């Protein structure tokens, strides 16, 4: 009953807000969407039945502005989810801007990969299948931009840590446990206290010239994913081995950059970052609590071009653990590629697209073909599939989750 009352109150407030601003100068936009997916294995169960209502309220007047972005996800057999993706105020001055509140912050040049794009944490409750403006979670932050010609200095202060959102344990996207079934979990160290010393800070310099667009960034943050500390024990009475898993978040520092330039019609993109303080799982019996701290580098090189009306984009991504030792569970070199093919038809009312992640270490992949058709002004029909190949690795572990889906969306 409390859930029903809470949902009703939120809906009333939401529609009251729409009524108050309708017809005034405040801009209103958003969309309504149905998303239905069916698994292509087993009994062809529904992978998802989701109805989405997304709203944007925006206004800029003189030296101030604001944006509020509430949303509702309704599911057939799950609790309805209400949220506020963004809610911020903008203050404009002669040489700098200030944005305060909940916001999504996007950095870097990569498509579908997060290297320097680390300010906004990720919502992986549906793995990597959500649209990227839904995967990036809003965070409460203060963002200041200072402009000098075509250059921008950006500073971000995040007072409260927000971790990656993982799938529920009953979700088809919940990763298979890597521990024994008898393992116990101790979450006593899994919380980062809300205090000043636990804040996150980021800085970025962006430059734009006639030849190149580039960014240089740095950050002192929390790793959005916890390290799995492990304590092995032996029951003195039965001599049975035991395992206690203790998720814990750690501080991490990083520095990196990205660039984009055009050479004879071909767009060349690059992005890289150096991470200090990452904890990796280790099989070394001498490793304290089964983890070891290492530095690592991740980089990307990408090409975009158009051939016979087809947009072609490719990326190669590599992650390298420095000062590697063989006891680390992860590979020293993790290699991945992405490919995007896209073409418009029927006066740009029909788009065919193929996007694929390819894991080169484990020969696994996520292949995502889709067709989008503009039925009428504001109405869009999308037909697609998510095909997982391989039997292990980041994508192969979901080999039984192949699905076909459609989305019907009205934007206003």
Residue spans for each PLM region:
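Outer membrane beta-barrel
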Residues: 60-173, 210, 390
